[in-house]
């Protein structure tokens, strides 16, 4: 842990209570000069740290800074039963999913944390921003700094993954739960991986699996989650303004990205230990597609394959059940659907991390 992280942790544990420079130097085992440099660096990052007359430092409010220490501290408070989860945070990265895939390929599952009372091992990769955020079907996920949350949860379940589709479905429900807890806002789901608030997309999920070539089973998965938190209209291109939104639409909400990262991660771990039927039931209750007329895109990029249908249901395997205009009922496990009035197939901000 860096000196800056140690100082931030110490001040965060004493919100609105001054901590002397000497006390910080002793607890961090560094010089007063190193403390002064760390304080200045934190101020440059936006932390409201005041100097007091007796030479102490006062943190006025919890800063919206994402790092390994702030996440570990928050996660330990929110989910003490999952404490010790392996986490890595980056200021910027090409893609959290790409990085997670790289370390999973190089190191295997040895670095994952075996979570007590769960059915597998986990780790989480978090970034302040992404330069090459990825979505489904090779699309881009726009990931600007300090306005969103971009994370990838690595999951290696006992016995492998029998139904990969349920991972995306479960994660979508988990994100909705986290947003409700932190912001008290109800969100809805567009099959299969998009979260909507006020008719605008605020989150996408990209799930990727690792197959054991000897057994043919999927041993591990990476669940990439990208959430727009406090963007305003100036943060979106004219194209994205038609489809993309954010949770807060400004930067004044007191909730921090660390709090959301903690809740999303914990809710995902929790829900992956639930029965599949209960997950599907909640997923269906949050879907806004059932009963709607849609266009089905079974092969992305091939407009000749598009057909119109009515959404009837979401079945127990997380497939979208539709009825085409000729009366045929189909269970969709891949592809995309769009409402006639929407622009949900925009090439950007489409999903994932």
Task: Indicate residue ranges for each PLM-predicted region.
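Short loop/edge segments at beta-strand edges and connector loops
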Residues: 91, 189-191
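Long, positively charged amphipathic alpha-helical accessory segments at protein N-termini or as interdomain linkers
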Residues: 1-31, 40, 44, 158-165, ...
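N-terminal lobe of the biotin/lipoate ligase/transferase fold
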Residues: 2-181, 201-203, 255, 329, ...
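Solvent-exposed beta-strand sheet faces enriched in polar/charged residues
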Residues: 50-52, 190, 208
């Amino acid at each position: 842990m860096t000196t800056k992280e140690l100082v931030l942790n110490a001040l965060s544990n004493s919100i609105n209570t001054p901590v002397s420079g000497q006390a910080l130097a002793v607890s961090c085992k560094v010089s007063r000069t190193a403390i002064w440099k760390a304080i200045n660096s934190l101020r440059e990052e936006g932390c409201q740290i005041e100097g007091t007359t007796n030479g102490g430092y006062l943190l006025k409010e919890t800063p919206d800074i994402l790092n390994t220490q702030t996440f570990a501290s928050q996660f330990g408070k929110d989910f003490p039963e999952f404490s010790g989860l392996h986490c890595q945070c980056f200021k910027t990265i090409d893609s959290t999913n790409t990085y997670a895939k790289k370390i999973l390929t190089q190191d295997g599952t040895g670095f994952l944390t075996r979570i007590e009372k769960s059915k597998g091992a986990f780790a989480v990769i978090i970034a302040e921003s992404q330069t090459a955020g990825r979505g489904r079907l090779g699309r881009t996920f726009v990931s600007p700094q300090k306005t969103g949350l971009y994370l990838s949860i690595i999951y290696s379940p006992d016995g492998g993954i029998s139904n990969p589709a349920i991972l995306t479905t479960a994660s979508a429900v988990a994100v909705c739960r986290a947003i409700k807890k932190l912001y008290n806002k109800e969100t809805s789901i567009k099959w299969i991986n998009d979260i909507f608030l006020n008719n605008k997309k605020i989150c996408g999920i990209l799930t990727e699996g690792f197959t054991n070539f000897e057994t043919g089973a999927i041993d591990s998965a990476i669940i990439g989650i990208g959430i727009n938190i406090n963007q305003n209209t100036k943060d979106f291109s004219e194209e994205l303004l038609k489809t993309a939104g954010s949770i807060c639409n400004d930067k004044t909400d007191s909730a921090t990205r660390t709090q959301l990262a903690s809740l999303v991660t914990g809710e995902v771990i929790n829900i992956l230990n639930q029965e599949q039927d209960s997950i599907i039931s909640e997923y269906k209750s949050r879907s806004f597609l059932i009963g709607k007329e849609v266009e089905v895109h079974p092969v992305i990029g091939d407009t000749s394959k598009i057909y119109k249908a009515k959404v009837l249901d979401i079945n127990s395997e997380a497939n979208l059940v539709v009825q085409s205009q000729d009366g045929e009922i189909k269970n969709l496990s891949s592809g995309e659907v769009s409402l006639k009035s929407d622009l949900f197939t925009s090439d950007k901000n489409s999903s994932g991390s």
